[in-house]
């Protein structure tokens, strides 16, 4: 053994200095110390003191290797030796980092990088305001926010009153309802109904991802399938799984989706789970956080009863008077990655998470009490695992709830671990704090709130003051905190990184929960970023900004402008800003791109865009990219040099081409990239080869950026590179052909003997100077550009002659006259050389400039040696090529051209051929800086909507690759908030009231002259409000109304009085019961007068009542008016209508667009008076003529003058209202005065028969946006249309001071014969469908000149039916009508398959129109839907009775004087009405206004999926009688395609829509079911939620039978979306939705039985049945029930229950329903097996959680259900259709492990069936009543999928129902 040469002393940790002489001795000593001796630190300190004491240095450094004693050792030694000591952890960190950079198998060793964060906090809507709040020490406590609940109503100082608390305040997020649903493709209606915490989680997740610069799928660690989402959420009442689920769904992440509930520590526990997922390799990126939004007082009461909450204010953390915690809102999100992935992806690392851990305080004295030992265990574990000494931790963010027990326990555990004594050095201070003292306790969001606070502290290098100590510090804390170097900041404290040791700050974050859980994180600073020495060489940069709306884009630009102004002196700003805004952002359709070489120039560019408002139109990605390859004559030295020097892709391709050139014997081409070379000194071979290689390298460059050509066109030499880009030639062959041709030219042709002349003139003009014997046309470049070839002398002579005639001509800088006789010597040899080249089939179209044709890939071989031979000799016909491209639609308005060449030669030619608007973009430019050219071109491509690979663009410039912390996305937020009302939590647990509750604020007993006495006023059950009022028609004031309106001597009640009563009651309903509808007005819809109310004698008591029923979950109420006797018993029904509540501003906005057409019609009538065609009738004449029909009192005589056009049934009048007492809301005499024009028009025109009188039978809608004034002068206008024999309809417009203020829409008159009998027994008229809003527009004169299509579209108004559909759509989605525009994308507003079903179902039911639910799949925008509807004649025929069918536009004189010439107008086609109606349905279902729909949008962006499409089509079918295919939205995905289809639809049915009766409310129907056996559970049946239905197929007005399908185990009507539309159209098919479709757990919680479940569905069935019977003349219709799977069992129970109420079900349809006798329900594992196969997810993957929950609930219901046989008289004829196959039919496919004793129904589902006897069903309905059908090649689930088998099954069903089989 050699002796050791001691370079440094070796010190033993046990025995002291080692004096070993040999290596063997040293090893023995080391082993003894390791295995035998104890660690003796005092001895070690003594030895080190001796060594360091001999040194002259004033400081020493200890470097630990795999030990954590270094910090303590330094402290003790420094004290002993009197010198400064420090720890250098470089070795340990290097080892840790090296380990973290290992393979994926080593992910468990990785540190976790935090790369993004965002949040919403009390009084702080963003991170900046949160930091401002923290650093200023703000206490955010305030009284309960008024948008949450009435704090005083739920407050009880004594704490004794049930469901109250002693808390009056908290910490609140301002406006937590703010959300941008369109951005996330959620409908406004769905947004309002979703948990606000989910919405804020979505927005903060996006903002955090944006801060992280995360673009999904950009790198290996950001692949969507490798991103997980983890959130903490504990508050009951929300569906917690949907919080991460919504985020995953929006971003299409498919990694783990987990909600963690550990009460107060939920968010930190969720972050721990996220870290574990990263360490385990389950995901590569994690979105983690927590949410807490306090929406009601419920939990306040419980927590207060548990003594958790402070009653005196905010959390007084560390204060001696701490008395509990303060509840708070909070939402926070962070983005996590493994450190090595974050470094590799150049992510902005905010901090590094060293470790995380969670445990439980099992040894605590109470589950809610923290345990110091458990907390210490976490601290020690994390320190030990990370090798960090406790003294290295400089800040601890405490949980700090402000409870006495919690604060003291936490302080004890922290101090015992991190500062047990005074061992911390002076530079090892430890600060403590808690965010809860500022923003309260966010409960499940508290941990992430603390984490974000710490991240902000690191960013700002400041410890904010702690504001929790209001008086004195907690007396339980140790008094020597300062001696321990522990501080609680009272002012902001600088917090810099340590200069010694690791140079990193270490932080602990502690979080524990009321349920006993403890979670903690150990953080440190991010690693220092290494800045490359090389600067970014690019002189010009591109900055991109995008948004999903124009307003968001403008606001994003404004925010960016402020950011640039604040950072304008940052020298690297522009390059890094370019990288951040391009490569590290998700890009959206509304775009702006600015190119700039300085920050000032960038600011100018932003300002220019904002001033020009260039952001209003979205870009589309459907662009047609053309690569245009220029020829010769534009080459210059150094072309492409900037790319050659700085872009690896371009340079690699150039060098590869150069190598091929050399290998083929050609010279090097690299000289052309040298600016110092003279081009004239390069031989043509080098120039031509170099040009072609340059072009091929540019193609590679563009392709690397994701820009690939859709077609190519090459000019002359450029066609070689074009053929290579199209795949015809390889790179090698392209070089070979170019080189051979150039070499032959040099060899066989004399350079400089010939020349080419570019002439700027048409060929015909040039021919005058052209000599064919010496001149040749070589290029036809454009209609005004030609090139001539010939000998130099001849060309110079021609140039001179042209100049003398002022024709521009320039010699082309080329050595040869290409495409002329000069090249003929090389042709044969060149052709022979080309024979060796293999010409491949092209991949994309090539526009040949030789042939002037488009050569498509499928064309037979065109390119070959002979082609190239001709190409060399024959002229270039660029003009013909461009025209051919246009003719073939290869070149169109969507085309974007990129010139592939050294200069913009072809760009000008393209504009000359195609037009100046052609988008042409250069790759290079002779005069301009290359980087500027490239930036401008990329900006152009970006504006065009192209998806660019920005990472590749920036890849070679490392210095710019830093993600800047830019302002976050600027949302188009609106407030979606459901107000907590009626203080319902106060009565939780109370016994159900035996009578309905009466609200505290009752209607006044004498409200108005028309509403005289309140008879009944109830709020309940459920959402229903009922008001019954009584009035005396013989009372003095109403007798005046009656006496002033005598018909044939009878004092008849005018319908205007009914309208006044409706508006009065509507106002009172809004005031008392709907404070959420402040500012709304009441519209009177579908007023139908059945029998007149007549006052027999003046002053004789004539009692009548008005009854209003309102469902508070809707915007409508039903009103009926009927006479009663003195005992209050109903005697005669007089009228009924619908009250609809709406914002009158939306009416005014709609009418404003109509006013122009109405005003022109009035002027047209006035012109007819001037021409003598029509007469102006005075007031006296009008009422004299009227007197033969109606005897009006002066109060009714408001008409001052009338212009009557009898032939067109059109009139206008001036109205001055008579002075009246103001004792009505809307004076009925004034309303009648306006409406009299209708009666006068119809009874005074030339075609009225002598014995006819037209009587008003109601109207479709009456909307009054403003109060009428007695001193105002009004103008009215109406045009009546014959819709059915003697029935006429029209809209009356009321105008004041140039503004339409009211519209009486769809006024209907019918002509009973004259006489008193006609009055007493008028023809009954059914009411229009309930629940509609419609507004037709009047006719406007059309000019004599045939208008353009654009003019027709511009002047075409919405029809009434369109508007009614829009209202339905707006209601279902949750938008106002004014927000419905054509560019509205249904997918943006959450119109999914279910919502589509709902909308189309309402259209069918309310408008009697058959619209397929797939309309919303085929029509992706409202604009497309409008066009679709406009094309369908069937729609217009169906609603012809409702409105005028077009508009007229006045004829103006040719001289433009404006003089009106009376011309009989043309009517617009009815297709526009159809389109408008469908648009209205879409808008209502999506939840936006019609105006928001646009042809530029895709329906999917509105949120329209298969289910919402079904809903929309259902409503179109029912309301418009328009039958669209169920896949309509699949085949019409955009508004344009829908518009085109609807406007082109012909052959529609000519049937007329007959108005239906009023739809009974659920409140009416419940009483009819009261004698059913489930009466004991009647509260469950009667209360909300309610079953809903969707009319999936058929029409109410034409149906011969109704089939109602009960939901299967999923609870969704969507299961029948494919089947129902295939069933015969004379069967109205309804599908039911379970009331608890998305909340199956409630079924179990409430203990719902199957009987009760069915009874809830039957309320909806009764409503459907009554609606159909009222709409039919014969008053009855056959009913069939049915169901698939478990739905069949529900259906037969429905048959039994309906029979008990006297309703007979004629037919029963069972679709693969399991045997109900002895039912053995499948176990949950089967459903999970099916879910894994994707069966339960309807082809979209795994089923949502709510589907599985509903399945579980149904299994439990069926388990306890015992079916009872039906009696012989009640058993319907029944059909059961079985699927023959089992799910596991394929032996090679997935199989489930089963046993013979497994559940019968499980085996029945999985394996092929052999028994089709249906014995169980026969025992219930009788063998004689049952028909069995079998469908082969389908299983239980696939039988419901689209395809031929579903048509087979639908035929079986249809034939059975109609008795055809």
UniProtKB/Swiss-Prot annotation:
One of its GO terms (molecular function) is phosphopantetheine binding. Residues 1582-1855 are annotated as: Thioesterase (TE) domain. Residues 1441-1470 are annotated as: Disordered. Induction: Expression is up-regulated in appressoria-forming germlings on locust cuticle. Expression is also up-regulated during conidiation. Residues 1442-1462 have a biased composition (Polar residues). Residues 1008-1312 are annotated as: Product template (PT) domain. It is an enzyme of class 2 (transferase). PROSITE patterns: CARRIER, KS3_1, KS3_2, PHOSPHOPANTETHEINE, PKS_MFAS_DH. Its EC number is 2.3.1.-. InterPro entries: AB_hydrolase_fold, Ac_transferase_dom_sf, ACP-like_sf, Acyl_transferase_dom, Acyl_Trfase/lysoPLipase, Ketoacyl_synth_AS, Ketoacyl_synth_C, Ketoacyl_synth_N. Residues 1174-1318 are annotated as: C-terminal hotdog fold. Pfam families: Acyl_transf_1, CurL-like_PKS_C, ketoacyl-synt, Ketoacyl-synt_C, PP-binding, PS-DH, Thioesterase. Residues 1356-1433, 1472-1546 form the Carrier domain. Disulfide bonds: none annotated. Residues 1012-1146 are annotated as: N-terminal hotdog fold. The modification O-(pantetheine 4'-phosphoryl)serine is found at residues 1393, 1506. GO terms for biological process: fatty acid biosynthetic process; phenol-containing compound biosynthetic process; polyketide biosynthetic process; toxin biosynthetic process. It comes from the Eukaryota. This is Polyketide synthase 2. It comes from Metarhizium acridum (strain CQMa 102). The lineage of its organism: Eukaryota, Fungi, Dikarya, Ascomycota, Pezizomycotina.
């Amino acid at each position: 053994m050699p002796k050791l040469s001691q370079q440094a002393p070796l010190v033993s940790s046990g025995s002291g200095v080692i004096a070993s002489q040999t290596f063997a001795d040293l090893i023995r000593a080391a082993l003894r110390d390791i295995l035998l001796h104890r660690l003796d630190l005092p001895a070690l300190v003594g030895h080190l003191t001796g060594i360091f004491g001999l040194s002259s240095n004033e400081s020493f450094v200890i470097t630990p290797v795999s030990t954590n004693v270094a910090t303590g050792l330094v402290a003790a030694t420094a004290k002993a030796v009197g010198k400064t000591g420090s720890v250098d952890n470089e070795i340990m960190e290097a080892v840790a980092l090296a380990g973290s950079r290992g393979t994926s198998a080593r992910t468990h060793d990785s540190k976790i990088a935090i790369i993004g964060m965002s949040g919403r906090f009390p009084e702080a809507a963003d991170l900046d305001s949160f930091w401002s709040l923290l650093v200023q020490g703000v206490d955010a406590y305030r009284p309960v926010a008024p948008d949450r609940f009435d704090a005083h109503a739920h407050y009880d100082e004594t704490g004794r009153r049930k469901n109250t608390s002693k808390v009056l305040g908290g910490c609140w997020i301002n406006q937590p309802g703010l959300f941008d649903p369109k951005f996330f493709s959620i409908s406004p209606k769905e947004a309002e109904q979703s948990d606000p915490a989910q919405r804020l989680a979505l927005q903060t997740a996006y903002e955090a991802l944006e801060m992280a610069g995360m673009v999904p799928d950009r790198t290996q660690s950001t692949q969507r399938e490798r991103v997980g989402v983890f959130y903490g959420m504990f508050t009951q009442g929300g569906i917690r799984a949907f919080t991460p689920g919504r985020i995953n769904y929006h971003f299409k992440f498919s990694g783990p989706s987990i909600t963690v509930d550990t009460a107060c520590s939920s968010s930190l526990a969720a972050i721990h789970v996220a870290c574990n997922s990263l360490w385990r390799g389950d995901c590569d990126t994690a979105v983690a956080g927590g949410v807490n939004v306090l929406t009601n007082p419920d939990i306040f009461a419980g927590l207060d009863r548990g003594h958790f909450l402070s009653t005196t204010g905010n959390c007084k953390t560390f204060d001696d008077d701490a008395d509990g915690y303060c509840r708070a809102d909070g939402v926070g999100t962070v983005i996590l990655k493994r450190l090595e992935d974050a470094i590799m992806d150049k992510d902005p690392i905010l901090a590094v998470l060293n470790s995380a851990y969670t445990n439980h305080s099992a040894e605590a004295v109470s589950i809610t009490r923290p345990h110091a030992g458990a907390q210490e265990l976490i601290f020690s574990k994390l320190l030990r695992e990370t090798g960090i000494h406790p003294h290295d931790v400089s800040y601890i963010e405490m949980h700090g709830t402000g409870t006495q027990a919690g604060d003291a326990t936490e302080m004890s555990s922290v101090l015992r671990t991190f500062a047990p004594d005074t061992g911390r050095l002076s530079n090892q201070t430890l600060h403590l704090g808690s965010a809860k003292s500022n923003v309260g306790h966010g409960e499940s969001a508290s941990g992430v709130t603390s984490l974000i606070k710490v991240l902000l502290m690191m960013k700002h290098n400041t410890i904010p003051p702690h504001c929790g100590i209001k008086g004195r510090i907690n007396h339980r804390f140790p008094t020597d905190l300062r001696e321990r170097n522990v501080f609680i900041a009272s002012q902001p404290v600088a917090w810099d990184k340590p200069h010694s040791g690791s140079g990193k700050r270490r932080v602990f974050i502690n979080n524990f929960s009321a349920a006993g859980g403890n979670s903690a994180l150990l953080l440190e600073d991010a690693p220092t970023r290494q800045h490359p020495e090389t600067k970014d060489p690019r002189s010009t940069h591109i900055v991109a900004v995008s948004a999903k709306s124009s307003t968001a884009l403008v606001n994003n630009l404004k925010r960016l402008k402020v950011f640039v102004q604040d950072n304008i002196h940052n020298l690297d700003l522009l390059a890094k800003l370019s990288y951040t805004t391009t490569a590290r952002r998700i890009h959206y359709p509304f775009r702006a791109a600015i190119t700039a070489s300085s920050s000032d120039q960038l600011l100018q560019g932003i300002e220019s865009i904002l001033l020009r408002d260039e952001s209003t139109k979205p870009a589309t990605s459907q662009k047609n990219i053309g690569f245009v390859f220029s020829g010769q004559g534009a080459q210059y030295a150094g072309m492409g040099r900037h790319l050659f020097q700085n872009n690896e892709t371009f340079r690699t391709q150039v060098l590869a081409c150069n190598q091929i050139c050399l290998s083929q014997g050609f010279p090097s081409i690299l000289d052309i990239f040298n600016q110092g070379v003279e081009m004239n000194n390069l031989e043509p071979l080098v120039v031509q080869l170099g040009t072609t290689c340059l072009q091929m390298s540019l193609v590679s460059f563009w392709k690397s950026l994701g820009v690939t050509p859709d077609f190519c066109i090459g000019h002359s030499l450029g066609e070689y590179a074009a053929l290579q880009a199209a795949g015809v030639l390889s790179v090698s062959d392209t070089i070979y052909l170019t080189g051979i041709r150039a070499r032959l030219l040099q060899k066989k042709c004399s350079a400089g003997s010939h020349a080419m002349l570019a002439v700027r003139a048409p060929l015909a003009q040039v021919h005058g100077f052209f000599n064919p014997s010496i001149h040749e046309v070589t290029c036809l470049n454009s209609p005004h550009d030609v090139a001539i070839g010939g000998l130099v002398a001849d060309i110079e002579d021609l140039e001179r002659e042209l100049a003398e005639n002022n024709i521009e001509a320039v010699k082309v800088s080329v050595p040869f006259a290409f495409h002329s006789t000069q090249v003929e010597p090389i042709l044969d040899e060149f052709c022979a050389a080309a024979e060796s080249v293999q010409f491949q089939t092209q991949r994309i179209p090539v526009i040949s400039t030789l042939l002037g044709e488009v050569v498509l890939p499928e064309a037979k071989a065109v390119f070959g040696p002979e082609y190239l031979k001709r190409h060399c000799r024959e002229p270039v016909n660029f003009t013909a090529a461009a025209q051919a491209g246009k003719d073939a639609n290869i070149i169109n308005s969507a085309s974007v051209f990129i010139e592939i060449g050294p200069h913009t030669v072809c760009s000008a030619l393209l504009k000359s051929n195609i037009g100046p608007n052609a988008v042409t973009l250069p790759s290079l430019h002779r005069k301009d800086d290359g980087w500027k050219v490239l930036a401008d071109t990329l900006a152009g491509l970006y504006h065009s909507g192209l998806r660019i690979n920005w990472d590749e663009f920036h890849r070679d410039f490392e210095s710019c690759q830093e993600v800047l912390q830019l302002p976050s996305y600027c949302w188009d937020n609106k407030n979606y908030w459901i107000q907590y009302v009626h203080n319902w939590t106060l009565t939780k647990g109370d016994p159900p009231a035996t009578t309905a509750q009466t609200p505290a604020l009752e209607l006044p007993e004498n409200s108005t002259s028309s509403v005289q006495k309140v008879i009944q006023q109830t709020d309940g059950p459920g959402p229903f409000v009922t008001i019954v009022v009584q009035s005396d028609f013989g009372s003095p004031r109403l007798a005046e109304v009656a006496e002033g309106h005598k018909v044939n001597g009878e004092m008849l009640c005018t319908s205007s009085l009914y309208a006044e009563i409706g508006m009065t009651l509507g106002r009172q309903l809004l005031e008392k019961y709907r404070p959420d509808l402040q500012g709304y007005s009441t519209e009177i819809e579908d007023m139908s007068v059945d029998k007149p109310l007549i006052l027999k004698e003046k002053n004789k008591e004539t009692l009548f009542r008005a009854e209003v029923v309102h469902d508070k979950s809707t915007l409508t109420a039903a009103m009926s008016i009927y006479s009663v006797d003195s005992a209050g018993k109903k005697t005669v029904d007089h009228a009924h209508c619908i009250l609809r509540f709406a914002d009158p501003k939306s009416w005014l906005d709609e009418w404003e667009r109509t006013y122009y057409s109405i005003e022109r019609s009035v002027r047209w009538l006035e012109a007819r008076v001037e021409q003598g065609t029509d007469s102006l009738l005075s007031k006296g004449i009008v009422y004299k003529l009227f007197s033969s029909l109606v005897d009006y009192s002066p109060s009714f005589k408001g008409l001052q003058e009338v212009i009557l056009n009898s032939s067109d049934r059109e009139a206008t009048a001036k109205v001055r209202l008579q002075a009246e007492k103001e004792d009505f809301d809307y004076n009925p005499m004034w309303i009648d005065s306006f409406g009299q024009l209708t009666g006068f028009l119809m009874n005074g025109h030339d075609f009225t028969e002598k014995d006819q009188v037209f009587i008003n039978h109601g109207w479709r809608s009456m909307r009054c946006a403003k109060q009428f004034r007695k001193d105002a002068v009004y103008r009215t206008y109406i045009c009546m249309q014959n819709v059915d024999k003697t029935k006429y309809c029209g809209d009356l417009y009321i105008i004041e001071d140039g503004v339409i203020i009211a519209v009486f829409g769809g006024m209907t008159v019918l002509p009973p014969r004259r006489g008193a009998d006609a009055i007493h027994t008028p023809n009954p008229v059914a009411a229009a469908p309930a629940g509609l809003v419609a507004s037709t527009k009047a006719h406007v004169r059309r000019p004599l000149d045939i208008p353009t299509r654009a003019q027709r579209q511009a002047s075409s108004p919405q029809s009434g039916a369109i508007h009614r559909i829009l209202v339905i759509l707006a209601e279902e989605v949750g938008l106002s009508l004014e927000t419905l525009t054509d560019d509205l994308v249904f997918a943006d507003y959450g119109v999914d398959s279910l919502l589509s079903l709902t909308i189309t179902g309402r259209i069918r039911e309310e408008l009697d129109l058959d619209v397929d639910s797939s309309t919303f799949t085929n029509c992706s925008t409202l604009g497309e839907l409008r066009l679709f509807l406009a094309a369908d004649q069937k729609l217009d025929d169906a609603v012809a009775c409702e409105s005028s069918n077009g508009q007229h536009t006045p004829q103006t004189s040719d001289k433009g004087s404006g003089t009106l010439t009376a011309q009989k107008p043309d009517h617009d086609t009815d297709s526009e009405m159809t389109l408008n109606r469908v648009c209205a349905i879409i808008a209502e279902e999506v939840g936006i206004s019609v105006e928001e729909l646009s042809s530029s949008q895709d329906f999917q962006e509105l949120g329209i999926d298969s289910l919402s499409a079904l809903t929309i089509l259902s409503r179109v079918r029912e309301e418009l009688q328009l039958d669209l295919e169920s896949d309509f939205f699949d085949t019409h995905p955009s508004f344009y395609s829908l518009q085109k289809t609807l406007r082109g639809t012909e052959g529609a049915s000519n049937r007329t829509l007959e108005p239906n009766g009023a739809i009974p409310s659920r409140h009416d129907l419940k009483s009819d079911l009261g004698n059913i056996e489930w009466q004991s559970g009647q509260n469950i049946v009667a209360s909300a939620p309610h079953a809903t239905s969707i009319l999936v197929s058929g029409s109410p007005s034409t149906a011969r039978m109704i089939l109602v399908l009960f939901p299967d185990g999923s609870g969704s009507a969507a299961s029948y979306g494919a089947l129902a539309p295939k069933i015969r159209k004379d069967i109205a098919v309804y599908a039911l939705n379970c009331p608890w479709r998305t909340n199956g757990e409630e079924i179990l919680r409430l203990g719902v039985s199957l009987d009760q479940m069915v009874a809830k569905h039957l309320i909806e069935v009764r409503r459907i049945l009554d609606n159909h019977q009222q709409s039919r003349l014969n008053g009855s219709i056959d009913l069939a029930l049915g169901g698939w799977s478990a739905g069949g069992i529900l259906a037969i129970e429905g048959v039994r229950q309906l029979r008990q109420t006297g309703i007979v079900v004629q037919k029963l349809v069972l679709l693969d329903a399991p045997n109900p006798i002895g039912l053995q329900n499948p176990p949950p594992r089967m459903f999970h097996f099916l879910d894994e196969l994707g069966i339960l997810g309807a082809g979209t993957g795994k089923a949502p959680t709510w589907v599985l929950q509903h399945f579980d609930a149904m299994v439990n219901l069926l388990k306890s259900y015992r079916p009872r046989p039906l009696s012989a008289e009640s058993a319907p004829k029944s059909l059961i259709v079985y699927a023959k196959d089992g799910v596991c039919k394929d032996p090679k496919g997935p199989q489930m492990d089963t046993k013979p004793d497994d559940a019968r129904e499980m085996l029945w589902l999985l394996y092929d069936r052999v028994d089709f006897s249906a014995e169980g069903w026969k025992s219930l309905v009788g063998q004689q009543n049952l028909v069995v059908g079998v469908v082969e090649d389908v299983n239980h689930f696939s039988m419901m999928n689209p395809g031929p088998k579903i048509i087979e099954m639908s035929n079986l069903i249809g034939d059975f129902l109609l008795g055809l089989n």
